[in-house]
Amino acid sequence: MITSGVEPKDLAKRGESLIRQSSNRYLTTVRIAFRAKQRRFDDFDGLLEESSVKPVQRAIVELSDEQDQPDLLPG
């Protein structure tokens, strides 16, 4: 059963990949939590469109995309 826009298996794979490729699991967990907190406040401020994806799920997807495709980052 899928209750959000993210497949649970895909989310688990992305999370495992983030942890596996990190040198420090704690800092990776903190980065995910910080990004989720930012997204949560963006949702409250109306900066993001309505989404069924929870902030933690969105943070994991964003961070794994940044890790897998660093050429997409500005700068």
Curated annotation (Swiss-Prot):
GO terms for cellular component: DNA-directed RNA polymerase complex. GO terms for molecular function: DNA binding; DNA-directed RNA polymerase activity. It catalyses: RNA(n) + a ribonucleoside 5'-triphosphate = RNA(n+1) + diphosphate. GO terms for biological process: DNA-templated transcription. It comes from the Bacteria. In cyanobacteria the RNAP catalytic core is composed of 2 alpha, 1 beta, 1 beta', 1 gamma and 1 omega subunit. When a sigma factor is associated with the core the holoenzyme is formed, which can initiate transcription. This is DNA-directed RNA polymerase subunit omega. The gene is rpoZ.
